[in-house]
């Protein structure tokens, strides 16, 4: 979502893509549409397309897709986080995005950039987040397509951690005249959201998000929940602080 704000700041025309591949955290698709609608209400128009790959759900083996094992809890660096890998996910997303970008570039005869939210916190547990994967994927795209030089990449957070991304979000919200909390409450990081749409605070993705908000010194505007029902940010924060203390001990 911060990347989308950065793209609105840098480009005259922005197209945003989301993917429905049968993920358990499908609430992210609803939040994406809500954010697009909010931005439009503030005069920032984005072409938004949701690409359905839900026919894959019965074919993929991962705790993140419907029918898979339970999503593990804890810190990202724990070995059990390999269960959250979706085979070839980023390759599928990259291929579709490259096809869209090149089609647009050929239609307009203009340079088109693919904006990627790659950041310094991307984890080694995900092989398709590694630099060697991205280099090989880009090479295959350029070998396999005519006029591929018309497509470039915009990676503003390559050397930035999640705290730095949130800090940029604060700057961008001021620049674009939008409210930080109104933006970020329309996001989802949780891999284990509740049926209500509220986020858990124990899965690794949620732990890392809350850790960044703790460092930012600002409450996370999303609603958290556990087996007792909705909980305050302070409850989620205390749980994450305990996880971080145990991990670093």
Q: What label would you give each PLM region?
A:
Residues 1-180, 206:
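ATP-dependent adenylation/nucleotidyltransferase module used to activate substrates
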Residues 109, 114, 187-189, 218-226:
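Charge-dense, low-complexity polyampholytic segments
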Residues 244-249:
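Short flanking/linker segments adjacent to small metal-binding domains or redox-active Cys/His motifs
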Residues 177-201:
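Immediate flanking context of iron-sulfur cluster ligation sites
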Residues 134, 166, 184-187, 200-203, ...:
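Short amphipathic alpha-helical surface patches that serve as generic macromolecular interface elements
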Residues 196-232, 236-243:
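Iron-sulfur (Fe-S) cluster-binding segments and ferredoxin-like electron-carrier domains
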């Amino acid at each position: 979502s911060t990347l989308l704000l950065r793209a609105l700041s840098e480009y005259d025309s922005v197209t945003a893509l989301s993917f429905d591949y049968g993920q358990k955290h499908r609430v992210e698709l609803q939040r994406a549409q809500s954010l697009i609608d909010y931005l439009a209400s503030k005069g920032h128009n984005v072409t938004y397309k949701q690409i359905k790959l839900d026919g894959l759900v019965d074919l993929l083996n991962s705790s993140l897709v419907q029918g898979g094992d339970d999503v593990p809890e804890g810190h990202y660096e724990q070995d059990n986080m390999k269960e959250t890998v979706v085979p070839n996910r980023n390759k599928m997303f990259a291929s579709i995005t490259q096809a869209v970008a090149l089609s647009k570039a050929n239609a307009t005869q203009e340079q088109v950039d693919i904006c990627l939210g790659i950041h310094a916190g991307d984890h080694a547990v995900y092989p398709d987040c590694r630099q060697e994967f991205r280099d090989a994927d880009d090479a295959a795209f350029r070998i396999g397509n005519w006029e591929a030089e018309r497509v470039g990449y915009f990676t503003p957070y390559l050397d930035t951690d999640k705290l730095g991304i949130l800090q940029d979000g604060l700057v961008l919200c001021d620049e674009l005249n939008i409210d930080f909390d109104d933006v970020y409450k329309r996001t989802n990081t949780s891999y284990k959201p509740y049926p209500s749409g509220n986020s858990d605070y124990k899965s690794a993705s949620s732990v890392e998000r809350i850790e960044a908000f703790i460092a930012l010194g600002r409450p996370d505007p999303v609603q958290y929940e556990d087996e007792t029902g909705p909980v305050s940010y302070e409850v989620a924060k205390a749980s994450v602080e305990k996880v971080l203390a145990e991990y670093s001990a």
